[in-house]
A protein has these predicted regions:
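C-terminal non-catalytic accessory extensions
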Residues: 125-157
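Charged alpha-helix within mobile-element recombinases
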Residues: 1-26, 30-108, 112-121, 127, ...
Length: 157
């Protein structure tokens, strides 16, 4: 084996073991970053007993997911290729939108929706309350949920 082949193999080996690779989302890093920035922000880092899982799932499904999808703006990157051919991600002010707005902006997005769902229904969900009202509701329901969990844990102890 010559030096060039050895260098290529070494480069491949390092890429397979590295977890923080740009534009590679096929490993667990994407899920863990979501847990850190979205889930843990609202649920906290403390232990939550398994018997509370159904309540937390209902909160996530009925309150948190609609808030994130229809009312929380996100930056979406624009890719620009520089003179050397490297792809640069740029986060511009005009690229801020909710995930629902981003879905609508994609070509052929209507074909990706579930059967029986159209953008008029999604707009009705998004327009049911303002962004501030949705955030207020999220905080109220979350506080009530965790007060119930704390009361049950105190009663069980």
């Amino acid at each position: 084996m010559n030096c060039r082949v050895a260098a290529l193999l070494e480069k491949l080996r390092v890429q397979e073991c590295t977890k923080s690779r740009p534009r590679r989302s096929n490993d667990n890093a994407l899920a863990e970053s979501k847990n850190g920035t979205v889930i843990r922000k609202h649920f906290g880092y403390g232990h939550i007993p398994g018997r509370q899982a159904e309540r937390l799932h209902a909160f996530h499904r009925d309150v948190l997911a609609p808030h994130l999808n229809y009312h929380r703006p996100c930056y979406f990157p624009s890719e620009q290729v520089d003179a050397r051919g490297r792809v640069r991600k740029r986060y511009r002010q005009q690229d801020i939108m909710t995930p629902c707005q981003k879905l609508r902006s994609l070509p052929g997005a209507a074909d990706c929706l579930r059967p029986g769902i159209d953008f008029a229904q999604l707009d009705a969900l998004a327009g049911a309350c303002s962004d501030n009202e949705a955030a207020r509701r999220l905080n109220q329901v979350r506080d009530k949920l965790f007060a119930t969990i704390r009361a049950e844990q105190a009663g069980a102890a």
